[in-house]
């Protein structure tokens, strides 16, 4: 068994930790955070002012995540007062936040489907998808949970 030194940023101290199950990162409290590689994938389409969003989250491990939150930011104004799925809420005029639910280590969560009306009939929209919260886990590969997708108003589905 080997030991590794974990430097706690901002604390000016180091904590000794057993490397045990593999790599982990330090939180601000000096506690070793679990490592989980959360990723989001799905499809987007836009046609006649209706924006269709499908997002599925998965965890490449090695640790499970009790819950995570994915943020969807839209470049176009959305009609106010639209109803969202039970696992989602409005985070602003152009932002929707959705819970993923539990993500097992090396497992996939459910898919969330959202139909949104835009103000007017835009020619295109840009949608940014990213993880806002992952239960405090360290994610050494955040690139697979951050996407910026151009969605032309063709009715075609654009995968991310």
Q: What is the meaning of each model-derived region?
A:
Residues 53-55, 119-148:
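Serine/threonine-enriched low-complexity regions used as flexible
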Residues 18-48, 79, 158-160:
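Low-complexity, acidic Ser/Thr/Pro/Gly-rich terminal tails and inter-domain linkers that flank the onset
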Residues 1-19:
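Secretory targeting and sorting signals
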Residues 39-66:
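Short beta-strand elements of extracellular/lumenal beta-sandwich folds
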Residues 67-97, 102, 146, 159:
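A surface/secretory-pathway sequence property marking extracellular, secreted
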Residues 102-125:
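Low-complexity, intrinsically disordered segments enriched in Ser/Thr together with acidic residues
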Residues 148-160:
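Short, low-complexity, Pro/Ser/Thr/Gly-rich segments in the mature regions of secreted, periplasmic
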Residues 58-64, 75-77, 119-121:
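Short solvent-exposed strand-capping/beta-turn motif centered on an Asx-Ser/Thr pair
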């Amino acid at each position: 068994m080997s030991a590794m030194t974990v430097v706690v940023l901002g604390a000016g101290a180091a904590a000794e930790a057993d490397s045990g199950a593999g790599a982990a990162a330090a939180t601000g409290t000096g506690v070793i955070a679990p490592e989980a590689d959360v990723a989001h994938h799905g499809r987007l389409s836009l046609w006649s002012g209706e924006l269709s969003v499908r997002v599925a989250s998965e965890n490449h491990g090695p640790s499970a995540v009790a819950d995570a939150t994915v943020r969807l930011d839209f470049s176009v104004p959305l009609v106010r007062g639209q109803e969202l799925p039970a696992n989602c809420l409005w985070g602003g005029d152009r932002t929707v936040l959705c819970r993923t639910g539990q993500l097992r280590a090396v497992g996939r969560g459910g898919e969330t489907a959202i139909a949104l009306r835009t103000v007017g009939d835009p020619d295109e929209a840009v949608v940014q998808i990213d993880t806002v919260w992952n239960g405090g886990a360290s994610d050494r590969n955040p690139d697979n949970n951050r996407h910026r997708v151009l969605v032309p108003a063709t009715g075609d589905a654009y995968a991310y």
